[in-house]
Amino acid sequence: MAKHLFTSESVSEGHPDKIADQISDAVLDAILEQDPKARVACETYVKTGMVLVGGEITTNAWVDIEELTRKTVADIGYVSSDMGFDANSCAVLSAIGKQSPDINQGVDRCDPLEQGAGDQGIMFGYATNETDVLMPAPITYAHRLMERQARVRKNGTLPWLRPDAKSQVTFQYDDGKIAGIDAVVLSTQHADTISQKDLQEAVMEEIIKPVLPAEWLSASTKYFINPTGRFVIGGPMGDCGLTGRKIIVDTYGGAARHGGGAFSGKDPSKVDRSAAYAARYVAKNIVAAGLADRCEIQVSYAIGVAEPTSIMIETFGTEKIDQEHLIQLVREFFDLRPYGLIQMLDLIQPIYRQTAAYGHFGREQFPWEKTDKAALLREAAGLK
C-alpha cells in the first residue's frame, strides 16, 4: 500500500447528539440497577430549552426521568442560560411505551441459553495493533482531544470553554504504518469574551500539544482551530440532538465497516449493541494473540433465533493462520448467542452512561476490552 491519508472525527460530551446518547444511557443504567431483566429502548431528542425522552421500556423499576435528565445535562456542564441550555430550567417531556409482545416472545425463552436475538441485523467488530489499545489511531486521538477539552473546561484551566466541541485528525500512512499527522481540526464552543487569537493559542497549548505525540507532528502539520472564527452559539441551541446519530464516532471512526445499528439507550438483549461489543472483544483478542495485525469480524442474527446466522472474518492479509481456522477458534472460544455473550461480557450492569461519550471501544474499563482469551487463542493456533 502506498502513502495515503485517513481521517476520523469525534465530538464532545456537550455535542447535542451526545447529550441525547448520555440521557438515554443514564435512563438505561438507572433501570438496570433495579431490574436486570428490563427491556429498554430509550430515545432522546434535545433542542433549545427542551428534552423529549421516548421509547419502549418494559420493567418493574421506577426511575425519575426528569431528575435523571436534569442531572445528566448538569454533569455535562449546561447549567446557565448564557450557554443556550440550562439543566435547571429546560422542559423535560416523556413519551414511553412498552416493548411489543411480538418481539418479547421471540427473545424470552424457558432455557436462557436459547434467548433469541432482539432483532435481525449485522454487527462488526474491529481491532488493529497500530495503537496500545488496539484501535485505529485517528479515532483514538480524536477522542483524546475531546476528553482533554472537557478536562480543561471543567477544572478551570480554560474557564471560557463551553461544552460543545468537535475534533478531527488526519493521519498519514506509509505502507500501512503511521508516518505522521497531516491535519488537526478542533472547534470548541466558547464564551464571547475570548478573542480568536487567545483561543487558538490556548487550545494549541492546553489541548492539542498535551494529547498528540510530538513525533507525529511536523512543520507541515496543518491546524484548524475554530476555523469559522466564532463558536458562541452551540449545544442544543445551535443544533437539535438525537440518540444514535454518532455511530461512526462511537465505533472505529470509519476505519471499519458498520452494521448501522446504534448503541445508546438499548439494553443488552439488543444485539445491535451487545453483539457489536462481543465482535470487538473477539477481534481484539485475535490481534492481542498475534493471530493477525488487523481483524474485522461480522456477525449476523435473525430475530428470535439464538445462534448467529453467519460469522465472517477479514484480516486484510495480515493473518498468521488461515481464516477458516480463525473462524473455528472463534466458535470454540466465544459464545456469540445473545445470552452467551451477555454472560461472557457481564453486560447486565449499569455501565452504559460512561460509554455514551468518547467512544465505546479502546477504553480499558469496559469488559469487552479484556484480552483474557489471547493466550488461549495463541496456544490453540499452535503459535509460539
Curated annotation (Swiss-Prot):
Cofactor: Mg(2+); K(+)
Pfam families: S-AdoMet_synt_C (PF02773), S-AdoMet_synt_M (PF02772), S-AdoMet_synt_N (PF00438)
Enzyme Commission code(s) on record: 2.5.1.6
Chief location bin: cytoplasm
Binding, Mg(2+): 17
Alphabetical list of PROSITE patterns matching this protein: ADOMET_SYNTHASE_1, ADOMET_SYNTHASE_2
A single cellular component GO annotation: cytoplasm
Coiled-coil ranges from the UniProt annotation: none
Gene: metK
Role description: Catalyzes the formation of S-adenosylmethionine (AdoMet) from methionine and ATP. The overall synthetic reaction is composed of two sequential steps, AdoMet formation and the subsequent tripolyphosphate hydrolysis which occurs prior to release of AdoMet from the enzyme.
Family: Belongs to the AdoMet synthase family.
Cellular localisation: Cytoplasm
Record HAMAP family: S_AdoMet_synth1
Keyword presence, Cytoplasm: yes
Organism per entry: Edwardsiella ictaluri (strain 93-146)
InterPro entries per UniProt: ADOMET_SYNTHASE_CS, S-AdoMet_synt_C, S-AdoMet_synt_central, S-AdoMet_synt_N, S-AdoMet_synthetase, S-AdoMet_synthetase_sfam
Chain sites annotated for binding L-methionine: 56, 99, 239, 270
Note accompanying the cofactor annotation: Binds 2 divalent ions per subunit. Binds 1 potassium ion per subunit.
Pathways involved: Amino-acid biosynthesis; S-adenosyl-L-methionine biosynthesis; S-adenosyl-L-methionine from L-methionine: step 1/1
Name assigned to this protein: S-adenosylmethionine synthase
Binding locations of ATP: 15, 164-166, 230-231, 239, 245-246, 262, 266
Any GO BP: one-carbon metabolic process
Reactions the enzyme catalyzes: L-methionine + ATP + H2O = S-adenosyl-L-methionine + phosphate + diphosphate
Keywords: ATP-binding, Cytoplasm, Magnesium, Metal-binding, Nucleotide-binding, One-carbon metabolism, Potassium, Transferase
Chain residues that bind K(+): 43
